[in-house]
């Protein structure tokens, strides 16, 4: 998952640059063996922008473009999608939040300072590894995703645990 920019930043990217970005980032994720790559806004921003959710298959990687910059809103919408006879538990909530992806993200690349967590993420922060890149949304390149994947590969996953030195 890559999280960055406001909805206004996303709109400013333009359709052609979006197509190129999805294709190129999808190729990197596909080469790394990822089944899914989700692109999500860091936050909604101050100006309302109406952008649509969309998806594309790039090789074996399903790329999801999710403009929801408010994690609480996304959580509420996921809860509304649950069937009335369905139990509300960690598994059903996770399934509703991640769909069409079939699992939680292993890696979240956050574009921005490491001192601020994205409000677009609520649920994902529990077990995903975060890699911060202090850059703006429009600066993101496939090489940045390659570097984040390499950083992730070097880590020892703690699944929400703390360093031994803490």
Role assignments for model-derived ranges:
Residues 1-166:
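Flexible, compositionally biased loop and terminal segments
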């Amino acid at each position: 998952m890559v999280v960055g920019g406001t909805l206004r930043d996303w709109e400013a990217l333009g359709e052609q640059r979006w197509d190129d970005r999805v294709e190129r980032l999808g190729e990197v994720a596909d080469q790394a063996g990822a089944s899914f790559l989700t692109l999500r806004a860091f936050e909604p921003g101050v100006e309302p922008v109406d952008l649509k959710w969309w998806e594309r298959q790039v090789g074996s990687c399903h790329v999801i473009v999710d403009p929801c910059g408010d994690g609480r809103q996304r959580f509420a919408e996921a809860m509304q999608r649950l069937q009335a006879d369905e139990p509300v538990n960690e598994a059903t909530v996770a399934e509703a939040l991640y769909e069409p992806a079939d699992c939680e993200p292993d890696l979240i690349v956050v574009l921005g300072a490491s001192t601020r967590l994205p409000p677009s993420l609520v649920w994902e922060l529990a077990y995903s590894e975060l890699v911060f890149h202090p850059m703006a949304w429009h600066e993101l390149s496939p090489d940045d995703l390659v570097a984040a994947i390499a950083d992730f590969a070097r880590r020892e996953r703690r699944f929400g645990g703390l360093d031994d030195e803490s």
